[in-house]
Design a protein with these regions (language model features):
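Conserved acidic carboxylate
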Residues: 8
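Acidic, metal-coordinating helix/loop segments flanking the phosphotransfer/catalytic sites
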Residues: 32-50, 58
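His-Asp phosphorelay/catalytic-motif detector in bacterial-type signaling
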Residues: 2, 47-49, 73-78
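Non-catalytic signal-transmission and effector/linker regions of two-component phosphorelay proteins
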Residues: 1-3, 12
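Short amphipathic alpha-helix used as the core "switch/output" element in two-component signaling
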Residues: 41, 64-76
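Conserved phosphotransfer microenvironments
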Residues: 54-67
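Amphipathic alpha1 helix at the N-terminus of the CheY-like receiver
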Residues: 12-23
C-alpha cells in the first residue's frame, strides 16, 4: 500500500489527483493540503510514501524547499514536484 499526500492549492487539481489515486488499488490517499509547510508537519507524524507537491502553493510557500526538507528528514519518502504553466 502506497500512502500518498497531495499538496496543491487549486481545488480542481486536488480533485484530479485524488481521482487518479483512487483508480489504483495499491494507492491510499492519506490527505490533501494546500500549503507546503503543512505538508512537512504531516510528514512529521504520518508515514507517507509519496508526496505529490505543487511547486508553489498557497501563500507562495515554496514547494521545492519543502520537498527538499521532506527528503532530508525522510529519505524513503518520494517527492514528486508538479507545476502548471
Amino acid at each position: 500500500m502506497v500512502r500518498i499526500l497531495i499538496v496543491e492549492d487549486q481545488k480542481i487539481m486536488q480533485k484530479y489527483f485524488e481521482y487518479i489515486i483512487m483508480q489504483e488499488p495499491e494507492f491510499r490517499h492519506v490527505q490533501t493540503v494546500s500549503d507546503a509547510r503543512e505538508a512537512v508537519k504531516i510528514c512529521d507524524y504520518s508515514a507517507i510514501d509519496l508526496v505529490i507537491m505543487d511547486v508553489q502553493t498557497f501563500h507562495n510557500h515554496d514547494g521545492l524547499s519543502a520537498g527538499k526538507e521532506i527528503r532530508e528528514k525522510y529519505p524513503y519518502t518520494k517527492v514528486l514536484i508538479v507545476t502548471s504553466l
